[in-house]
């Protein structure tokens, strides 16, 4: 059986309106829209059809170089925990996998890069705050016709009778999606479509949970009036001051208050904890995990939640593959924090998080650099110059064994 397939090639759409690019999987190579976007391009474009066919024939398609490059370095890759299919599924469905889009159910929308944070692993193309810091001008290629075509595709797709998934999940990315006016317009549109079908549709946001009160109130008010279930993806991976350093601009106290409001909301169906693992978060990761469990016990004991992590591969300086193997003790602390909560029935898909922890161990020290501390310090010093702060260097404490 082929070793190159991944369910993401069939189930995912990731559309970026500001840069006019489309991906099938957030880690895949992006492809520019044609001058005139078409519905065919969105879900059955030539490139993704080629990728699907090649991956079934054991060919490593260049779209997925992010994962292939990780494997070539001896690292674990996103595919290891993101792929949801196995050989039995492929065998039973192979006749319809080449030229079919009925498996799509995970639709990621990035309206723009408006953001209030300047995370040290992010870039100007994903954060307006970083672009402002660096004095970088990013071309906004937004085209109103693209939105018209996408809305038409989305409506036609949702109303189809042959869709296989029981639930369609529509995720808003950023930047910080709740700060984008486009977000509210699209939510209204999706709510209207949902009235025409009995399919289960969940709206989801990937948020930094750092919104000031006026914006947080606006999001909560929209959730209050929604007829759909919501998922809240929370982007964070560290605790307290470490989190504030990695996610420059974060207010940990405000994060905690917003986290509580999100998990307590009656329309919230699922909370997705989305840590981005890097050299500066390993030491406090177990503290963050413990804190998360405590929040649910105190404020939302009946709410389901899960973990869906990722690794930093860029900037390279923050990749845990360069650390020595002794740092495994911090991964083991994180593992212990999870196993302490074995009886928590509201932590769903727990096996996926256990697999992710295992891949952390595999990635650690895979490309060991004996000068990792010097590299990290120089990286932070460069960031401090741009961000006009002297506080980031405190993150070096996270590298104390």
State the predicted function of each range.
Residues 102-114, 125-152, 164-183, 193-215, ...:
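Core AdoMet radical
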Residues 226-233, 251-400:
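Conserved C-terminal portion of the radical SAM core fold
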Residues 17-19, 32-36, 196-199, 296-305, ...:
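Intrinsically disordered, low-complexity coil segments
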Residues 153-157, 183-192, 216-221, 255-263, ...:
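Short, well-ordered amphipathic alpha-helices
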Residues 10, 24-27, 118-123, 181-186, ...:
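A short acidic (Asp/Glu
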Residues 16, 221-222:
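Acidic/polar residues at beta-strand termini and the immediately following turn/coil
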Residues 1-145, 163-164, 351-401:
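N-terminal pre-core extensions flanking Radical SAM catalytic domains
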């Amino acid at each position: 059986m082929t070793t190159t397939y991944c369910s993401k090639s069939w189930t995912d759409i990731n559309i970026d309106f500001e840069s006019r690019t489309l991906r099938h999987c957030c880690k895949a190579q992006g492809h520019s829209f044609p001058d005139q976007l078409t519905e065919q391009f969105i879900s059955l474009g030539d490139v993704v059809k080629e990728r699907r066919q090649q991956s079934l024939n054991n060919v490593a398609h260049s779209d997925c170089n992010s994962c292939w490059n990780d494997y070539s370095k001896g690292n674990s890759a996103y595919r290891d925990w993101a792929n949801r299919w196995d050989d039995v599924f492929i065998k039973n469905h192979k006749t319809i996998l080449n030229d079919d889009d009925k498996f799509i159910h995970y639709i990621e929308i990035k309206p723009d890069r408006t953001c209030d944070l300047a995370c040290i692993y992010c870039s100007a193309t994903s954060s307006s705050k970083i672009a402002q810091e660096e004095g970088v001008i990013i071309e906004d290629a937004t085209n109103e016709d693209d939105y018209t075509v996408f809305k038409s595709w989305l409506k036609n797709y949702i109303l189809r009778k042959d869709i296989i998934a029981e639930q369609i999940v529509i995720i808003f990315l950023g930047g910080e999606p709740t700060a984008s006016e486009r977000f509210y317009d699209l939510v209204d549109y999706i709510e209207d479509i949902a009235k025409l079908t009995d399919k289960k549709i969940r709206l989801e946001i990937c948020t930094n949970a750092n919104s000031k009160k006026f914006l947080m109130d606006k999001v909560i008010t929209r959730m209050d009036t929604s007829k759909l279930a919501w998922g809240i993806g929370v982007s964070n991976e560290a605790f307290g001051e470490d989190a504030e350093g990695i996610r420059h601009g974060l207010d940990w106290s405000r994060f905690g208050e917003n986290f509580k409001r999100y998990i307590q909301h009656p329309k919230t169906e699922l909370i997705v904890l989305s840590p981005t693992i890097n050299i500066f978060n390993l030491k406090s990761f177990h503290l963050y995990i413990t804190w998360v469990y405590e929040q649910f016990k105190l404020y939302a004991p009946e709410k389901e939640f899960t973990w869906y992590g990722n690794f930093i591969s860029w900037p390279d300086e923050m990749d845990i593959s360069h650390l020595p193997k002794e740092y495994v003790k911090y991964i083991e602390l994180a593992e212990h924090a999870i196993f302490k909560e074995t009886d928590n029935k509201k932590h769903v898909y727990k096996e996926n998080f256990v697999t992710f922890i295992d891949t952390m161990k595999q990635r650690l020290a895979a490309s060991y650099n004996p000068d990792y501390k010097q590299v990290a310090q120089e990286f932070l010093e460069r960031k401090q110059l741009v961000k006009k702060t002297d506080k980031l260097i405190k993150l070096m404490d996270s590298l104390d064994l």
